[in-house]
Amino acid sequence: MSRKLDSPIKTQMAVALVKSPLNGEFREFNKVGMKTPVGRRRVFVQTETGCVLGLELDRSDNAHTVKRKLQVALNFPIEESSLTFGDLVLKNDLTAVRSDSPLLLTRNNFHRSSSTPCLSPMRADLQQRRDESSPIEILGNSVSFSFVRQMAKDITKAVKKGIDPVAVNSGLGGAYYFKNSRGESVAIVKPTDEEPYAPNNPKGFVGKALGQPGLKRSVRVGETGYREVAAYLLDKEHFANVPPTALVKITHSIFNVNDGVKASKPMEKMLVSKIASLQQFIPHDYDASEHGTSNFPVSAVHRIGILDIRILNTDRHSGNLLVKKLDGDGMFGQVELVPIDHGLCLPETLEDPYFEWIHWPQASIPFSEDELKYIANLDPLGDCEMLRRELPMVREASLRVLVLCTIFLKEAAANGLCLAEIGEMMTREVRPGDEEPSEIEVVCLEAMSLIGEKDAESPRSDLGNDIEFQFDIDCEEVTDCTKKLALPLGLTFGNARGQLSKVEETTEDGEEEEEEDREEEENDRADLEKMPTIKLSMSLKSTLLGEKSQKYQKHPGARVESAYASSAHRSADEQIPSSTSFVKLSDMSEEEWTIFLEKYQELLYPAIEKRKSITLGQKQRQRLGTSCQF
């Protein structure tokens, strides 16, 4: 039987509601069973080890008072600590924090290990406080969450009747099926502090604090839940069929709390509160890995692919595509695809995506008129404003990735590329021991180089004499070379023989063309040596961007074995398969970002045309056969 939800909280990770008199009138219900008085904000403060505190803030409260309340309630040390709200470090003023927002409290320069326990509330405090909040509170007030609100009410009724959730055994992180009063699974809940490598991961994948690099280095531990919600909010008109998803504070005794001491006797199950993503559970017959793809509707594959392109999904494998039969036989066109697990989308840097559908025949079929119209109507800047409003904790670098990918999708679709071609342009070519930038990353690198040329040619009075335009590329420095990368002035992507343009392989139809290419490469290399150096700071000092034969070294720490099979007793850094970051967007100022976008859009058309010519050449060779040479 489930513990009564109004019982005293006895927990290592509980929401302890700090009591204070409630003055003034109450606002409308904006959560499940919770009211917030006028002039106040309710926020949720989470420590880097997963402890959660629900707080009612007055107008007079500041970052220091929030820390003090957390210290009193959870016995959490606040010396040398930082309170963050997405990218924003809250020094004192809390005006930027909206109601129902999650905040993260981290300790600066605090050495942690996988055995670091979650600091417990004082037992005296536990006896004095009761969790007077609702078992489920939705973080945010979007109208898109109306279905989730009703679902939360159904779950609350079921829990009060003693219908317990069930833990999901598969996967790397903690996940739980919550049920309605009839005992039917209606939602899957994924606590943020039970993600892979998070402090309370129930499957041994621990060793990181919340906010540190996670399974993907560009997606931080504890932030996949935000991305699940972002994917749902970005799926306008339910175009790709993403199930309703919201970020919630949820309380139950089933959740996992790792005991750092590993006591000899099992810990007593206690009510614990977590910040988690809550997504509608979709009954299905199988996933895409358990069935052939030939009967998948073209439109469903296209719609999911369009979403994956926009959000740069780095984890679209067949296991997170649910398949529902719409008739008894499941004949062609009679199945429905439901995409789930979007926690590794919207990375903070341009990552190498994984698109399972890229080689499916449906992806090579041209977009329909309805799909082209949907793509044309996408508004990346409007989408960013929506996410800033609904999920203000999403980091600005992730929003910039959304903008770049959506702009590319719109340009590519308008110029006749199919889904497979678009996906190929975004995907890196990986060879044993090497990782090379994708075609889109090459466009970004060239846009950066053109900005560098502009800075070298024009006076710097606009930006200030002491500002150096700098982009960091997080690649390992593998040689003793320390010379700055020199790029030719006037370099344009339209010239297929330009240094950066040649990062992508061209179609070679004969020996004569190959010989001409080699001669032109030698001439370009000679011209390169004569050009002045541009102040484009890069750590990739050993690499000439203009030559794909120069291999991009893998990020240090990359391993052959998969992190999915690694020993949980090794450090999280050892378990994470590294990925090189060729393009970093977070360091750009707003002015630099605006200029970069202009250059990026200018370079997209010639890059797309080049891809079309490559595809045409491949089709011609397929028709003629590989033995034919002219």
Swiss-Prot record:
**Start and end of every Ubiquitin-like domain?**
41-98
- Give the span(s) annotated as Catalytic loop: 312-320
Per the UniProt record, one Pfam family is: PI3_PI4_kinase
Region called G-loop, residue ranges: 168-174
Phosphoprotein listed as a keyword? yes
Fetch the PROSITE patterns from UniProt: PI3_4_KINASE_3 (PS50290)
CDD domains found in the cross-reference section: Ubl_ubiquitin_like (cd17039)
Gene Ontology MF: a single term: ATP binding
Keyword Transferase in the entry? The reply is yes
Which reaction is recorded as catalysed by this protein?
a 1,2-diacyl-sn-glycero-3-phospho-(1D-myo-inositol) + ATP = a 1,2-diacyl-sn-glycero-3-phospho-(1D-myo-inositol 4-phosphate) + ADP + H(+)
> Which family does the similarity line name?
Belongs to the PI3/PI4-kinase family. Type II PI4K subfamily.
- The name this protein goes by in its record: Phosphatidylinositol 4-kinase gamma 5
Q: What is the lineage of its organism?
A: Eukaryota, Viridiplantae, Streptophyta, Embryophyta, Tracheophyta
- Per UniProt, what is the name of the gene that codes for the protein in this document? PI4KG5
